[in-house]
């Protein structure tokens, strides 16, 4: 049983799902036009109609399939969803006299959605249409200065609507509203990592059977490492995890992965392909070309190794729920594409996919990793790009430059951990620039590389702020780097947000 969120195009739809799961309720996102049969497959205890950019009067405006609003479950409409509920029930929706974007104070509020909430209520508004005439059976339960109909409810039909976003952090008490909706739906809040680990293991066993062999391409990141542990528990030696060392890893990463996974029962095969990757990258400076070469070489190395290992019926992938959401078009699951941890696979490779994490978010995978015993230094590690240090080494990639960058990166990341700053950053990295400049070391002139340090904070990686690291810490890092990595004589810190910059430099 679940809460089904019908997505009508809001940028915040994913947050609704996350908030419900944080409250202990399983929830799924389906296209706003999903069929009644598809929705009923989820056995919903409640439905949320998301916001979106459309107007209910637009030609071709998205709307739920026939019969959805007749289901005998509570329904919550958010922004466009509220307008649609009101419109379909016979109310009026018109272009607002004054648009509301950003924070607004509710001048009054009440009703079941607001039960237990007291004091000031700040809401995040984003709408150009408003409900101007209530449908029969509804009552207004919240207002702002400029929006007299900010929240509505019909307790007889259990239909509720809000003209703001309770799911965003800018609505501080929105979480309590969503919790109240779960109570209205009668949801048992038992969605947690402990509850689902056994289900995931049993699901893999049911799919693979008693004899099926499973192949996993492992990157060393939290998703594939956690998946390796889960599969090892599910099928034991019938799992083979292939870890390709392309020579573009962080310092000591190969050894860390082997030390973390092998003692926990993962049948791990490590492939040393450094020479092949660096050989193909020689003379290449364009970042997109570097990515393509690395993806191609991953395929080749993976094919060479798997040919030695015998036949596999199943290929496991660490696909997460955001991948599924982003890949689903209006037709729903039929348009979902595969996401390959190994950089892509040939079209003619015939595997059955095993994707236990396809309904999970990253934070849920991290919690499963904790339960399965994955060491914290891997479980809580910052994101690392598939092409590795190749896209943090600007210009041509050589073994010498990778060695320099590995040492700089290790000093920076180790320093963040030492000073207690690592967990406060969402991602931190070092970049080796092709810029060389004059410096003085001792009494001698130097002409060496410039290293750039970057750290950001973000909730979703769609936008990011540069991390305000202490000056004393940055000074310490600069001093350590130029003294321990003699090929570097200048260190800079990137203070650009996203946008306009991306988090990675290439």
Swiss-Prot record:
GO biological process, one term: GMP biosynthetic process
UniProt xrefs under Pfam families: GATase (PF00117), GMP_synt_C (PF00958), NAD_synthase (PF02540)
Keyword Nucleotide-binding part of the UniProt annotation: yes
Pathway assignment: Purine metabolism; GMP biosynthesis; GMP from XMP (L-Gln route): step 1/1
Active site: 79 (nucleophile), 165, 167
Reaction equation(s) it catalyzes: XMP + L-glutamine + ATP + H2O = GMP + L-glutamate + AMP + diphosphate + 2 H(+)
PROSITE patterns, A to Z: GATASE_TYPE_1, GMPS_ATP_PPASE
GO cellular component, one term: cytosol
Residues binding ATP: 219-225
The keyword Metal-binding is annotated on this UniProt entry: no
Keywords annotated in UniProt: ATP-binding, Glutamine amidotransferase, GMP biosynthesis, Ligase, Nucleotide-binding, Purine biosynthesis
CDD domains found in the cross-reference section: GATase1_GMP_Synthase (cd01742), GMP_synthase_C (cd01997)
Gene3D superfamilies tied to this protein: 3.30.300.10, 3.40.50.880, HUPs (3.40.50.620)
Domain Glutamine amidotransferase type-1: from-to ranges: 2-190
Domain GMPS ATP-PPase: 191-381
Enzyme class per UniProt: ligase
EC number: 6.3.5.2
Its job: Catalyzes the synthesis of GMP from XMP.
Protein name in the entry: GMP synthase [glutamine-hydrolyzing]
UniProt organism field: Deinococcus radiodurans (strain ATCC 13939 / DSM 20539 / JCM 16871 / CCUG 27074 / LMG 4051 / NBRC 15346 / NCIMB 9279 / VKM B-1422 / R1)
């Amino acid at each position: 049983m679940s809460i089904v969120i019908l997505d009508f195009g809001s940028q915040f739809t994913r947050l609704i799902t996350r908030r419900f799961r944080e409250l202990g309720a399983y929830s799924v996102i389906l296209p706003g036009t999903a069929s009644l049969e598809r929705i009923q497959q989820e056995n919903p205890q409640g439905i949320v109609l998301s916001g979106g950019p459309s107007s209910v009067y637009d030609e071709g405006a998205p709307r739920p399939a026939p019969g959805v609003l007749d289901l005998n479950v509570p329904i919550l409409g958010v922004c466009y969803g509220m307008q649609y509920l009101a419109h379909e029930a016979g109310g009026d929706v018109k272009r607002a006299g004054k648009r509301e974007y950003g924070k607004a104070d509710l001048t009054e509020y009440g009703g079941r959605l607001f039960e237990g909430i007291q004091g000031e209520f700040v809401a995040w508004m984003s709408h150009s249409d408003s409900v101007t005439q209530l449908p029969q059976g509804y009552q207004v339960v919240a207002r702002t200065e400029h929006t007299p109909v900010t929240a509505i409810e019909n307790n007889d039909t259990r239909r509720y609507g809000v003209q703001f976003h309770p799911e965003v952090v800018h609505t501080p008490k929105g979480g309590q509203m969503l919790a109240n909706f779960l109570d209205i739906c009668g949801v048992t809040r038992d969605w947690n990592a402990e509850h689902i680990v056994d289900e995931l293991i049993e699901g893999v066993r049911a799919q693979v059977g008693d004899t099926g062999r499973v192949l996993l391409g492992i990157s060393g990141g939290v998703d594939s490492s956690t998946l390796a542990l889960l599969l090892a528990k599910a099928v034991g030696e019938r799992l083979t995890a292939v870890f390709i060392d392309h020579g573009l890893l962080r310092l000591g990463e190969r050894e860390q992965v082997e030390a973390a996974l092998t003692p926990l029962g993962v049948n791990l095969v490590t492939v040393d392909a450094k020479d092949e990757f660096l050989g193909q990258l020689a003379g290449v400076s364009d970042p997109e070309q570097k990515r393509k070469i690395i993806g191609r070489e991953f395929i080749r190395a993976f094919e060479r190794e798997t040919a030695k290992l015998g036949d596999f019926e199943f290929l496991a992938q660490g696909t997460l729920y955001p991948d599924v959401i982003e890949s689903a078009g209006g037709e729903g699951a039929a348009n979902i594409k595969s996401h390959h941890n190994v950089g892509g696979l040939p079209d003619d490779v015939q595997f059955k996919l095993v994707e236990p994490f396809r309904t999970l978010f990253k934070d849920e995978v991290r919690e499963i990793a904790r339960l399965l015993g994955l060491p914290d230094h891997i479980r809580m590690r910052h994101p690392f790009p598939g092409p590795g240090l190749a896209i943090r080494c600007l210009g041509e990639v050589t073994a010498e430059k990778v060695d320099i960058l590995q040492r700089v990166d290790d000093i920076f990341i180790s320093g963040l951990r030492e000073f207690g700053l690592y967990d406060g950053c969402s991602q931190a990295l070092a970049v080796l620039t092709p810029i060389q400049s004059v410096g003085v070391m001792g009494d001698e002139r130097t002409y060496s590389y410039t290293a750039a340090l970057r750290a950001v904070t973000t909730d979703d990686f769609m936008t990011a702020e540069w991390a305000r690291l202490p000056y004393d810490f940055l000074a310490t890092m600069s001093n350590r780097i130029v003294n321990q990595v003699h090929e570097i004589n200048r260190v800079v810190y990137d203070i650009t947000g996203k946008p306009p910059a991306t988090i990675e430099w290439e």
